[in-house]
Amino acid sequence: MNAVDGTHGRWPSQLGALTLALALGLGYAPPLAASPDFIHADGKRLVDGRGETFVIKGINLGNWLVPEGYMFKFKQARSPSEIAGFFDSLIGPEDASRFWVKFRDVYITEEDVRFIKAAGFNTVRVPLNWRLFAEPGDEPSHRYQAAGWPLLDRLVQWCREAGLRVIVDLHAAPGGQTGVNHDDGPGYPLTFYVPQNRQRTIALWQKLAARYHAETAILGYDLLNEPISPYSDVEYLNPQLERLYRDIVAAIRSVDQNHVVLLEGAQWGTNFAVFHQPFDANAAYTYHKFWINPTRDGLQSYLDFSNRWNVPVFIGETGEFNNSWNDKFHRLQERFGLGWCFWPYKNLDSDLSVVSIQKPVGWDLIAEAGSSAKAPLPARAQAQAIVNAYLEAAKFKNVRVNADYINSLGLSVP
């Protein structure tokens, strides 16, 4: 039996969970009626509290808390900070701040969560930007004001009530763990070079784990998204990855013995050669693959890793190709008992997502301005009207459901 299995009596009491949350000033307490039904690693499987195999069928909530340029049709403003700066120029800083509050409120709602569950998914993976969870004064721009905590709390509650599991994914770590736009860093993986960034990353995970240690809706903690791009100094950086993972896990385990820790390989999550013998009894390993042939050859190294170390493996991001490929690839994963999380749930004017935001009239003007410094900005009043139309279009009641996409994953439109 796994060391964190409930039969070993290691679940915190309901009163103890509440007391710890309040003592730490976390502002969040787990449900007092929650059952000890954590997902945990058991050999090559993930299992629930009853010992039944849990195969992840997940979707990524991309663009919600970590905006990406291509999901707005921007070619130049690509990172979250670049996108934020563009909106400051487009409609002014004050209106831009109001835009982001509304954006986060409408992009993922309880209706979206219920739809995801009804379609047949059992998991959502939520990318986080550390800036949204930083202490006051710790984040250089001071613009985010720890806005992420109530949003994540709310999502977890919705998922618990809907019967979905949540993978918490640190998509943009302090300093940037990847060296590309979606880690919101300077273009190089400074998480590994700057001691302050490293310590902030460890401290954030400890705080997340302390807050959610008794929350059964959370499946696990995806410690770093796609660390160390192949463009970086991989000979130096790759050996640093598992060392950082060990330190993060030690911090997590000091407050949370319940949740699975999810470890991604280097170079877009593909390279498992950076790993040695597993160092935590409740760990799973996750890889990312896009646009590969849907054959066993593409999975073999991960199957070998799983067999060698007797650990669970699943794919944390994939998709954005076509529906025929989706069908073949998800079936291939399931054939070998591997879970999956496709990317993304919602996108703008796309057939390659679960739902699509209908492009508002005039959005091409915004997209052009976000794609070239030479493109003129629309007049502010016009830009504000277009942005408001986008927010309305992003609401669940107004999106287009991509039934063929959902069907290609072996699921169905409710």
Region spans (language model):
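Outer-membrane beta-barrel biogenesis signature
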Residues: 35-38, 50
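Bacterial N-terminal signal peptides that target proteins for export
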Residues: 2-18
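Extracellular glycoside hydrolase catalytic/binding regions
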Residues: 38, 199-348, 352-370
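Sec/Tat signal peptide C-region and signal peptidase I cleavage site
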Residues: 30-33
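Extended, alpha-helix-rich binding/interface surfaces that flank or overlap catalytic cores
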Residues: 332, 336-414
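Active-site mouth of glycoside hydrolases
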Residues: 41-47, 53-56, 60-260, 265-273
